Amino acid sequence: MKFSAITTLATFLAIVNASLCTYDDHPVNGLRYYIGAEGVPDVLGICNGFWDNVKPQCGGDWQCGQAANGDLHAEFQAYRKCLPRFINDGWWYATKNQWGSIECKLRQ
């Protein structure tokens, strides 16, 4: 599942040249967010800034870094109190939407 999520995210980003956020809602495990952006020159710096903005509301198991194709890829598990708007706002504060805005959507 992890490979398919990363592949789907990378394919989508290559098509639209933008940023993307999706999430899964698991009955037991809570929410799992997937964030991606292409063209980010300082992936580690943006990852750290983004997580600094999101961590107070969301906490959780966090992974963020550069994908094999060079794009930023982040994913993390959080409790249901971690609303999509916290992610959207955290991205804006970290990037000022320089690589596109995100609006987290539930995966169907």
Task: Identify the meaning behind each predicted range.
Residues 1-20:
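Fungal secretory targeting signals
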Residues 11-14, 40, 51, 57, ...:
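Residue-level signal for mature regions of secreted extracellular proteins and peptides
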Residues 15, 25-26, 73-77:
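A general secondary-structure boundary signal
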Residues 19-56:
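Short, surface-exposed binding/anchoring microloops in extracellular/periplasmic proteins
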Residues 20, 47-48, 59, 88-89, ...:
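Intrinsically disordered regions, especially transient/low-confidence alpha-helical propensity segments
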Residues 49-70:
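Acidic, aromatic-enriched beta-alpha/helix-loop junctions
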Residues 63-107:
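Extracytosolic low-complexity repeat regions of secreted or lipid-anchored proteins
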